[in-house]
Amino acid sequence: MNCKVKLVLIYESNDEEAIAPVLARWASAVIAQRAEFECCLLDTSLRRAALPHLTRADAFLIFASEQSHGYSADLKAFIDQVAIRWQARPVAFIGYGGESGGINAIGQLRQVLAGQHAVPICSAVTLANPWALLDEDGIWREADQARIPMARMLVQLNWWARALRSAREKKPYELVSQ
């Protein structure tokens, strides 16, 4: 079976800098150029509408804004409210923030999602001060720092998504997680 990987991009539209939707659109456009993914953008404020998409997902890509060396309370609430949906699915991250580029938020999210039986992948994209690359129209101009890490992350995410989807089809994760 060689069907597309159903990838859900999760972002917060209410982040203080209002850059998450901009970055999500950029990532969605990059992913749309790749034949292996079917992509869906999901705003964390739309929790009820999210469930069908999360249930069908093979993989997740989370945008993590770093706030006080961690991630937002809204994202934490979203993760907790849809806990069962993460099981045996890979998760990748695009972190953003000040000089750290969101690396602290990503580190915390990896721990939390591993506790939810998700599989956080190693590669991530970290964007230091991404709002500095917004043009006058509010369009994010892709920095060279993002191209190679994004490609590497998507290759790994595709591999993990297919491997875990195959494993879930052979034996549902619920049967081995108890």
Question: Which residues does each PLM region occupy?
Answer:
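Residues at the starts of beta-strands that form the adenosine-phosphate
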Residues: 6, 38, 90
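N-terminal beta1-alpha1 ligand-phosphate binding loop
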Residues: 2-35
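Helix-loop-strand module that forms the ligand-binding subsite of alpha/beta enzymes
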Residues: 49-120
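Short hydrophobic segments within beta-strands
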Residues: 10-12, 42, 94
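Generic secondary-structure signature for well-ordered alpha-helical cores
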Residues: 29-36, 114, 118, 155-166
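A general structural signal for well-ordered alpha-helical segments in protein cores
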Residues: 20, 24, 72-75, 106, ...
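A short beta-strand-loop structural module common to alpha/beta enzyme folds
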Residues: 35-46
